[in-house]
Amino acid sequence: MKKLLTISFLLALTATTSFKGFSQAFKQGDKLLNAGIGLNSYYGNGLPIGASFEVGITEAISVGGQVDYNSGSYGGVGYNWGYTALYFGGRGSYHLNEVFKINNDKLDTYAGIGLGFQSFKWSDASFGAGSAYGSGVYFNYFVGGRYMFANSVGAFLELGSTGFSNVRAGVTLKF
């Protein structure tokens, strides 16, 4: 009986031990769509919304695009000022689980950079003024993580220069 228990224990241990080498939440060929909101707008008003899409081109690198939108207005006695901001561009990420030895198939950590165009327009209805001041080429950088609740649905959080805020959170869909 003792021999049977020992053999059963060893078989159970062998069956639950992973021989894959490294379990990972991100891999080559993954398609990731993030949709979220900015939690801290650079402009102090409005709620930045944005989306990014990336494709895994290697086991650790993804490339794709990003778009962000924000608008807001300020008003008071004698003035009414508003703005609209739009960002679109490319982005790339390096996925860090293997670097940091994170062996979790639900967690994906990454850092990345982006390059795009930012359009910023403001108007002052009180004085009939307006401008596109602040528009032009825009460089962004970020660190982030996503946790997959299921194979195709998760949540993400990014910190850094992430469009129009320095904190972005939302939903991730994996295809």
Question: Model-found features: residue ranges?
Answer:
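Short glycine/proline- and aromatic-enriched beta-strand/turn motifs that initiate or cap beta-hairpins
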Residues: 19-57, 172-174
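Transmembrane beta-strand segments that form the barrel wall of outer-membrane beta-barrel proteins
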Residues: 29-42, 63-71, 115, 152-162
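Short loop/turn motifs that connect adjacent beta-strands in outer-membrane beta-barrel proteins
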Residues: 21-30, 60, 97-108, 149-153
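Residues on the lipid-exposed face of transmembrane beta-strands in outer-membrane beta-barrel proteins
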Residues: 35-39, 51-55, 90-96, 113-115, ...
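Cleavable N-terminal export/targeting peptides
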Residues: 1-29
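Gram-negative (and chloroplast) outer-membrane scaffold detector with strong preference
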Residues: 54-127, 175
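Outer-membrane beta-barrel proteins
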Residues: 25, 39-41, 53, 76-80, ...
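Residues that define the transmembrane beta-barrel architecture of outer-membrane proteins
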Residues: 29-31, 45-49, 82-88, 107, ...
